[in-house]
Amino acid sequence: MTTEKENVTTAVAVKDGGEKSKEVSDKGVKKRKNVTKALAVNDGGEKSKEVRYRGVRRRPWGRYAAEIRDPVKKKRVWLGSFNTGEEAARAYDSAAIRFRGSKATTNFPLIGYYGISSATPVNNNLSETVSDGNANLPLVGDDGNALASPVNNTLSETARDGTLPSDCHDMLSPGVAEAVAGFFLDLPEVIALKEELDRVCPDQFESIDMGLTIGPQTAVEEPETSSAVDCKLRMEPDLDLNASP
């Protein structure tokens, strides 16, 4: 009888212990779920505050990578890795202006945020998939700061004045001169066109000395054969057709 009571008591104790352990386990699961939910809410809040830029990806270790697609070669061009998303976005905007000119879609407005010098060079530290054809693009510093690109002083002065040199006016009609002067007023368009032409046609024509001369300096080679033809003048008879026979 005593043994049976002990077994019942042990069974009840085991049952109570199992329920208690299960209750403790359930509390632990709920606590972990609450912590996970709180972290998720916190991460969501941070993500909602972060601004996303075109052409910029955030690395898991915190840096920002920028890249752009070459519209001609249809390949991705690596622009570099930056400390902040804004620096990476500026690098993308500079590359977009290089590739598409004033029609580029940028992260920041072209007017007001970017001046004439906004057409900053593109880093030629390209991905291995890009051919060497893009190697002639100007550089961007390793720290992400764009190097200044020189602009033709004559072109800048002409664009600021909005006028053409006098010798050009002499050769053009008033209507054509006015239209050309209006073209030079839009300096970003001129720079974009020049850069596009330089990128598409990088080769330039240069004069080559072929060693040919015309005139008294032309050298005449004598024949090497000894059988030279001896040409003698033929004496024509002095005939007077008007004389009487």
UniProtKB/Swiss-Prot annotation:
Involved in the regulation of gene expression by stress factors and by components of stress signal transduction pathways. Transcription factor that binds to the GCC-box pathogenesis-related promoter element. Acts as a transcriptional inhibitor and may regulate other AtERFs. Keywords: DNA-binding, Ethylene signaling pathway, Nucleus, Repressor, Transcription, Transcription regulation. It comes from Arabidopsis thaliana (Mouse-ear cress). It comes from the Eukaryota. This is Ethylene-responsive transcription factor 10. One of its GO terms (molecular function) is DNA-binding transcription factor activity. Pfam families: AP2. Its main location: nucleus. PANTHER family: AP2 DOMAIN CLASS TRANSCRIPTION FACTOR, ETHYLENE-RESPONSIVE TRANSCRIPTION FACTOR 10-RELATED. Contains a slightly degenerated ERF-associated amphiphilic repression (EAR) motif, which may be involved in the activity of transcriptional repression. SMART domains: AP2. Residues 52-109 bind DNA. One of its GO terms (biological process) is ethylene-activated signaling pathway.
